[in-house]
Structures are given as C-alpha cells and as structure tokens.
Amino acid sequence: MGLEEKLPGGVLLASVEKLANWSRRSSLWPATFGLACCAIEMMSTGAGRYDLSRFGMEVFRASPRQADLMIVAGRVSQKMAPVLRQIYDQMPEPKWVLSMGVCASSGGMFNNYAIVQGVDHIVPVDMYLPGCPPRPEMLMDAIIKLHEKILAGPVTGRTAHTESGSSPYPKPIDVATARAGLPAGELDTRTLSVNDRKRFRIPAGAPVPTGRGAVEPVLDTRRPAAIAPPSVFGRAKGIPVDAKPLDESRAHGPGPTTADIADAADTADSDAAPGATHDTP
C-alpha cells in the first residue's frame, strides 16, 4: 500500500519491541523461591504496606512454568543448586533472575563447603541486591531497575544458550548427572568453583575447570584420614603427640559398638594409678 515509503525505516519494528518489553515489564510474575531469612523481607514486600502489586507483580507463582522472574532470596546450599537450576530451566523464555542478599550473591558469611559462593555459578543473574537482609524498599528499587533494563533490552530477551558455547551464561546442568557424581566431561565446568566441584564430586584426573575458583590441578575425592596430624590439631584438641591413627580397616566402617566402649573403659581403669578408687552408684 506504499506505507513503508512514507515512514522512516525501523519505526514499526521499534514500536513492536517497545510494546512487547513494556508488557513484560508491567506483568512480571515471580517464582516462589525463598531460601532463607531474605524471604521474610520478600514476603513483606508483597504485603499491604509496600504493595508490590502496584508494579504488576501481585502473583507469586508456585509453578516455574508460569513465572518469568526468579528472586533467589537467601543462601544456596550445594544440594539445592541442582534443584535451583532445574526450576530455572523450567521457566519459559524470556526470564530474569534477581539475586537478593549477599548470601545469594557471593555466599555472604557462609564461606564454607556447604554453600554455593554466588548463585551466578548456577544461573545467569540480571540484578544483584546487597544487604543482610535487604529491606523491602531495597528490593522494590532493584525490581524497578530491572524493569528499566527489560524496557531497554531486545525483544528476544537475553542471548539464548547455544551448542557452540558462545553464550556468556552457564549452560543447563543435568540434575541426574550432577547427583550421580559422573565425570566432569558430562557437566559444564566452565563456571564451577572449588565448592561446586566438591558438590559434583569431580574425580581425580578429570579435566580441570577453567572458570573462577579453579586453583588445584586435581580434586581428590577420597575420604580424609581418620585422625588429623598431631602437629596441626594434636595440642589444640588434647591428642597426645604419639597418638596413632585408627585401624584403616575400621576407619571408614561403622562407629564403635557398646563392647568397644566397654573395653576402652576397662583399659582406662587398668591404667589408672594404684590405689585409685571409683565411686559406684
């Protein structure tokens, strides 16, 4: 009809993108994914005092297939990481992730083997929110900033995962593979930290991850010795310097039985000083 000759190029396409992004920004449905104390502040944000429904987010969906925003509120344990990734993969595209609190963003005070040191090791994060825990006003400010990012972003959302590995975001982790502890070749190890590798039990001799946290050449998953070296822990815990390690045949077996405890008590009584008496009830 000659309409394209009267309008500058790209006007209709730009209008469609803006309309689509405006619709997505105005109707974000978060997934119910509270993990720790930050979830209390997230629930307060949805209550009447702050009224998150003003921004079109009054519905927290219990099904990830009906949500497009994941608010990770709290620390993520190593056992929760595969579940988090599975829920993220079940969310339809386009989708966004908001890391709420320092525990979800970087591990926070939980710098140990049981906590993932940042949820960005598992899923791509679009907005980081500091605080321990952040107040509802801070969460609403982060959501508004995310709205602005969505409005200015492409209509196709973020870059999709590609088989060639050109995407800057982690690839999906197979939950069954991660729980089974299979070799590292069947996992995406580009972004696995040391704690993540311990969680997925990458065996000795497997390819070393190249992501952040990959410091040791080999991760040995064998069980530790029964007794730590006395030079390190002996004096602090009262272990004699000449203490001998436990029998290897029993070090990894079941704990001591009642008979073993009784034998140890008899041995201690026989080694007591002469003339020592014990009160009996």
From Swiss-Prot:
Record's subcellular location: Cell membrane
Binding residues for [4Fe-4S] cluster: C37, C38, C103, C132
Co-factor requirement: [4Fe-4S] cluster
Catalytic activity field: a quinone + NADH + 5 H(+)(in) = a quinol + NAD(+) + 4 H(+)(out)
Topology within the bilayer: Peripheral membrane protein
Any one Gene Ontology molecular-function term assigned to this protein's record: quinone binding
EC numbers on record: 7.1.1.-
Keyword Membrane among record annotations: yes
GO cellular component, as recorded: plasma membrane; respiratory chain complex I
Any single GO BP term: electron transport coupled proton transport
Keywords from the UniProt entry: 4Fe-4S, Cell membrane, Iron, Iron-sulfur, Membrane, Metal-binding, NAD, Quinone, Translocase, Transport
UniProt KW Membrane keyword: yes
Region named Disordered: 242-281
InterPro entries assigned: NADH_UbQ_OxRdtase-like_20kDa, NADH_UQ_OxRdtase_20Kd_su
EC supergroup of this enzyme: translocase
Pfam families in alphabetical order: Oxidored_q6
Location (main, coarse): membrane
Subunit structure as annotated in this protein's UniProt entry: NDH-1 is composed of 14 different subunits. Subunits NuoB, C, D, E, F, and G constitute the peripheral sector of the complex.
Family stated for the protein in its record: Belongs to the complex I 20 kDa subunit family.
Record's function text: NDH-1 shuttles electrons from NADH, via FMN and iron-sulfur (Fe-S) centers, to quinones in the respiratory chain. The immediate electron acceptor for the enzyme in this species is believed to be a menaquinone. Couples the redox reaction to proton translocation (for every two electrons transferred, four hydrogen ions are translocated across the cytoplasmic membrane), and thus conserves the redox energy in a proton gradient.
Protein's name in the database: NADH-quinone oxidoreductase subunit B
Species: Frankia alni (strain DSM 45986 / CECT 9034 / ACN14a)
Taxonomic lineage from the root: Bacteria, Bacillati, Actinomycetota, Actinomycetes, Frankiales
Gene: nuoB
